[in-house]
Structures are given as C-alpha cells and as structure tokens.
C-alpha cells in the first residue's frame, strides 16, 4: 500500500460540481492499493497515519500527530500511485489492484483508520472523477509505503 500524505489546513473533494466531502486542519491521504496488498498492509497504514508526527509543537518542531492536534483526515483512493512510466511515455497500471479488489480493501482501510484514529475520516468516492482541493500547510508531503513482504 502506498500513500501520499499531505499536511493541510483544509481539503475538499468535489464531484460533478458539488462538494462531496471536506475537512479542516489535518491530513489529506491519497491512497493506492497494489495487487499484492493484504489486510496486514491496511492495518500497518491505519496505525501509522494517525501517529505520524508531522505537526509542529510549541517549539516549531514536527513533533505532534494528527491525533494530538485533534485534526481530521480526508482519504482519496488513487490507483495512479502505482503507475509505471519507466518505458515509453504512457504509464501502465499493472501494479495497481483492479477496482473489484481495490474497492473492498479501500473501504476496509477507511474502517480501520476510523477505529485506530478515533478522528473524523472523510473520503472521496471510489472510482469517481474527483476534483481535490487543498491548502497545503508547510508544505509537508510524505510518501509512505507498507513494508515489503
């Protein structure tokens, strides 16, 4: 599982011109599911994200987690995180899990993240054409990948 994590002041998802979901301060998580991902990958990521210390403490150091600041999470499924553009100019997506596999894993990941964090967790709409807006705070952007098996 691969996630691009952005510390945000706010973020939202719009679908078909209508606001679908939004958060205030917290994390925008673009989540990619690979063909090889299992429940263990989802569990690892759902434990890591709420405890990732990328928010500043009183001394200006990245020392606080989204849990500690009482923030929110917006999780958006993004199969393109497993794009392979090493040959040619058109990326291939053979590493990404097919949607019939990825959607239940994504839904399970969100469920685990809600339980693990105890925080509000909003989502995009799996497979939809979405416009994602954000105000990046910092900016702070981190790529996380579940451990290789």
UniProtKB/Swiss-Prot annotation:
Keyword annotations: Cytoplasm, Hydrolase, RNA-binding, tRNA-binding
Location of this chain's protein in the cell: Cytoplasm
UniProt superkingdom: Bacteria
Pfam families: Tyr_Deacylase (PF02580)
Subunit structure: Homodimer.
Motif (Gly-cisPro motif, important for rejection of L-amino acids): 138-139
Role according to the record: An aminoacyl-tRNA editing enzyme that deacylates mischarged D-aminoacyl-tRNAs. Also deacylates mischarged glycyl-tRNA(Ala), protecting cells against glycine mischarging by AlaRS. Acts via tRNA-based rather than protein-based catalysis; rejects L-amino acids rather than detecting D-amino acids in the active site. By recycling D-aminoacyl-tRNA to D-amino acids and free tRNA molecules, this enzyme counteracts the toxicity associated with the formation of D-aminoacyl-tRNA entities in vivo and helps enforce protein L-homochirality.
Transmembrane segments: none
Record bears the keyword Oxidoreductase: no
Family in the record: Belongs to the DTD family.
Catalytic reaction(s) noted: glycyl-tRNA(Ala) + H2O = tRNA(Ala) + glycine + H(+); a D-aminoacyl-tRNA + H2O = a tRNA + a D-alpha-amino acid + H(+)
Lineage: Bacteria, Pseudomonadati, Chlorobiota, Chlorobiia, Chlorobiales
GO biological process: D-amino acid catabolic process
Protein name: D-aminoacyl-tRNA deacylase
């Amino acid at each position: 599982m691969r996630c691009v994590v952005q510390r945000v002041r706010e973020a939202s998802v719009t679908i078909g011109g209508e606001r679908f979901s939004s958060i205030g301060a917290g994390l925008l998580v673009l989540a990619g599911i690979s063909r090889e991902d299992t429940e263990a990958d989802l569990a690892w990521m759902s434990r890591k994200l709420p405890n990732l210390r990328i928010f500043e403490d009183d001394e200006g150091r990245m020392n606080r987690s989204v849990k500690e600041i009482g923030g929110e999470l917006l999780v958006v499924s993004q199969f393109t995180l497993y794009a392979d553009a090493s040959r040619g100019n058109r990326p291939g997506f053979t590493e990404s899990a097919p949607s019939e596999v990825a959607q239940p894993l994504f839904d399970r990941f969100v469920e685990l993240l809600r339980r693990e964090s105890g925080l509000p967790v909003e989502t995009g709409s799996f497979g939809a054409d979405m416009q994602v807006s954000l105000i990046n705070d910092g900016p702070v952007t981190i790529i996380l990948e579940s451990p290789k098996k």
